[in-house]
Amino acid sequence: MTIYLLLAASGFIAWIISTIGGGGGAMLLVPLVGFVAGAQAVAPVTTLATLVAASGRAFVFRRDVEWRVVGWALPGAAIGGLLGAAAFSSTSAEWLQIIVGLFLISTVLQYRLGARKRTFEISLWWFFPAELLVGFLSGLVGAMGPVMNNLYLNAGIVKERMVGTKTAVSLPMHMVQLGTYSALGSMNGKLFLFGAAAGVGALASNWLARRFLREMRARDFRAIVICFMALSGIVMIWGQRAVIVAHF
């Protein structure tokens, strides 16, 4: 019972932070899930937790969705998520996490800690290939952190619109991933309970997090998002420190 309460409390805190930071709640759960269930359980457990939490977030932010972005991003995310989850049991993704971590850290320099609104101009169709890649990587490791935030910031989508739009894209993707994990035998009853516990805790945080977000200035939001991206990158690289040490 203690483990389930710890997962629920961690989910609650992680999703408040991730809402204010533009996503990446599952990333904060990775160390705990890896400790209680093992590294191989991280992807299916965090996917279920994200799915449960995102259902509440989708309701809370339902009026803030940029549907033009969803039209491009959702197909890519669903296809990528399916392919990544299918390859989950037979693919090693350690170096991918290190590369993504370095990219996330670099955003601090790109945006000058939120002082710059954009670093490059984008077109909406970019969301399809970007979500295809991120969906695939998410299927492999379960949590990619706020990787897509760079694209959203450059599209001028911030605060509630970023959270609402990202949720509308990620919710179906995580449904596809969870179904694939279950079909391939990567999700069992115990892992389901772990994911559900973290997800229920996260679900309760959505309303409180939205109140914080409403009162935040756009520039402050950008600065927090960028700092959280860098922190997520550090966490990803730290999680693969054994791989780096072994290589050198």
Where are these regions (language model features)?
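Membrane-interface helix termini and inter-helical loops of multi-pass transporters
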Residues: 30, 85-94, 119, 181-193, ...
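Membrane-interface helix-boundary motifs at transmembrane edges
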Residues: 63-68, 115-122, 155-160, 213-220
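Loop-to-transmembrane alpha-helix entry segments
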Residues: 67-72, 90-104, 215, 219-223, ...
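Small-residue-rich hydrophobic segments that form or flank transmembrane alpha-helices
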Residues: 4-72, 130-135, 143-206
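Transmembrane helix exit motif
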Residues: 54-64, 85, 99-123, 207-211, ...
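Residues within membrane-spanning alpha-helices of integral membrane proteins
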Residues: 4, 47, 100-104, 108, ...
